[in-house]
Regions:
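N-terminal secretory/membrane targeting signals
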Residues: 1-27
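A generic, lipid-embedded transmembrane alpha helix
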Residues: 71-90
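Alpha-helical membrane segments in multi-pass integral membrane proteins
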Residues: 133-145, 156-163
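Membrane-interfacial loop-to-transmembrane alpha-helix junctions, especially the N-terminal start
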Residues: 8-13, 63-74, 126-135
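Hydrophobic transmembrane alpha-helical segments in integral membrane proteins
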Residues: 25-48
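Short, hydrophobic transmembrane alpha-helix segments
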Residues: 26-34, 54-64
Length: 163
């Protein structure tokens, strides 16, 4: 497959993803001008969409050893954008903090960030796979412990200490 074909395919994927944005951006109810939490969800969502486009476009401009980490960055920001659009809708509909959805987002994106960290580290120097697994297991323990503490499964302090 030629480089031009790959660039065209990436551009088509980005265009297709961005064409879905109006549907994701359409809240069931309208944000009120003084709803700063809802507005912050909206701003974060849009920033994440812009970051996604940036990371995917930049994969065509960097050396090969950086392409995978930029692609993972784009995936992280895309997944987070979708979750933040959804969290905004939950906030507007209920007026409550969407804690469970925030942790679902983190359970997906934080491990991806650890993968990205490992990829960047590996691009710079020789590292063992053991580092990757220690960081990944620590990440999962931190997230599950934090969630358990936040929702009261093991008390706030128990979750704080574990997380």
């Amino acid at each position: 497959m030629s480089l031009i074909t790959i660039k065209g395919a990436k551009a088509s994927l980005i265009a297709a993803a961005l064409s879905l944005l109006p549907a994701a951006a359409n809240a069931a109810e309208t944000l009120k001008a003084d709803d700063y939490v809802g507005i912050s969800f909206w701003l974060i969502s849009m920033a994440l969409v812009a970051a996604t486009a940036f990371f995917f476009i930049e994969t065509t401009r960097v050396q090969g050893k950086w392409k995978t980490s930029l692609t993972v960055s784009g995936l992280v920001t895309l997944i987070a954008a979708v979750h933040y659009f959804y969290m905004r809708d939950v906030w507007i509909a209920t007026g409550e903090t969407p804690t469970v959805y925030r942790y679902i987002d983190w359970l997906i994106t934080v491990p991806l960030l650890m993968i990205e960290f490992y990829l960047i580290l590996r691009a710079m120097t020789a590292v063992s796979g053991g580092i990757f697994w220690r960081v990944m297991i620590g990440t999962k323990v931190m997230l599950v412990g934090g969630y358990a503490g936040e929702v009261g499964y093991n008390g706030e302090w128990g979750g704080f200490i574990i997380g």
